[in-house]
Regions:
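N-terminal helix-turn-helix DNA-binding core of bacterial DNA-binding proteins
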Residues: 2-35
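Short hydrophobic beta-strand motif reused across regulatory alpha/beta modules
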Residues: 52-53
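Alpha-helical residues within the helix-turn-helix
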Residues: 31, 48-49
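Generic detection of well-ordered alpha-helical segments
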Residues: 8, 75-79
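Key DNA-contact positions within bacterial/archaeal DNA-binding proteins
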Residues: 38
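Basic, amphipathic "hinge/linker" alpha-helix immediately C-terminal to the N-terminal HTH DNA-binding motif
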Residues: 58-76
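Short, hydrophobic-biased segments on the C-terminal half of alpha helices
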Residues: 44-45
Length: 79
C-alpha cells in the first residue's frame, strides 16, 4: 500500500511523538498536527492496513513497515 502525503505526515508524527514521549494516542497526534480528532481517527483506520497497530489501551505503534516509512520521511524533512 502506498501512502499519500497526509499519511506520511501521520506516520512521521507518530514516530516523533513516540521518540519524545514513549507512547502515542490519537489525541496526541491531533494536538501535535493541529487537526481534529475525527481526522486522526480516519487516518488511523487507513494506516492500520500495514503501517500501525493499536493496543487495548488505544496506544498507537508503528509496524516495522510503518517505522521504515516514518524514518525515511523524518530524514527527508531534516535535510
Amino acid at each position: 500500500m502506498n501512502l499519500y502525503a497526509s499519511g506520511e505526515d501521520y506516520v512521521e508524527a507518530i514516530l516523533v511523538l513516540y521518540k519524545k514521549f514513549g507512547s502515542v494516542r490519537s489525541v496526541d497526534i491531533a494536538r501535535h498536527m493541529e487537526v481534529s480528532k475525527p481526522s486522526v481517527c480516519h487516518a488511523v483506520n487507513i494506516l492500520k492496513e500495514g503501517f500501525l497497530t493499536i493496543d487495548e489501551n488505544h496506544f498507537l505503534y508503528l509496524t516495522s513497515q510503518g517505522k521504515v516509512v516514518a524514518e525515511k520521511i523524518y530524514e527527508r524533512h531534516r535535510l
